[in-house]
Amino acid sequence: MKKFLLFILTFTFSFSYSQLSTRTIEVKDGQMSKFIEMAGKKTKKFNNEDGAARFWTYEILTGSDAGKIWRMQAATPEMRDNWDMNSEEVEYWQKNVSPYIANGSVNGNYMWNYAGPYSHNVDSENQNHVMMLVYTYKDSGEQDFWRFRERVVAARKAMEPAPKGSMHSVVCSSGCNGNVAAILFEYESWADQQNYNQEMLPKMIEKYNELYGNNAYEQDGSKVDKALTENGRGRIHLRFIPEASSD
């Protein structure tokens, strides 16, 4: 995940929001290892050079899409405008990767903006276990929702030691119903996540209250609850696959 961080930071040096797209891929039964191998070869061949789009690949571990692939692309608007469906890159994918996709099942093409001010990036290694929290908030709740995210970032940055894994925030810009945001937390493993929840999360809450007043975390969290739509909160776990991702 470190290279993901470096690429995103390069984008966000010039502007606060970077454009991402995601899609969900269903792999044929028994072909996951082959899909990962061939998707990795394609990605290493075409998506590591300057001026090329970058891709990151995850396996979905929980939820209705468990067992599928979640693939993220980062590209500038110029890259998207000049995308050629007849390019060598696309032909390589169709010839070498598509045969392992079930019935051409590539779904859920969503566009996201990377929300740099609401993300906390640390120089981490081996943080390949990801928890993604997905929120849908009301128009009237936008300020309360993002104030809380901003304060969480400030509290994390003030912690000593800082959390080992990064926290990335993205906002859906196309394809979603309503105001959708996703927060991705990086860990080394399930055990590392449990350890964070038991040891680091209470320290983060303590720092939050130290910065913003007694019980501020609980009060702001309550405002977020009211800011969300009905059933506007979800949780998905992912496994980052570095061998099928840009370096």
Where do the PLM segments sit?
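Bacterial Sec-dependent N-terminal signal peptides
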Residues: 1-20
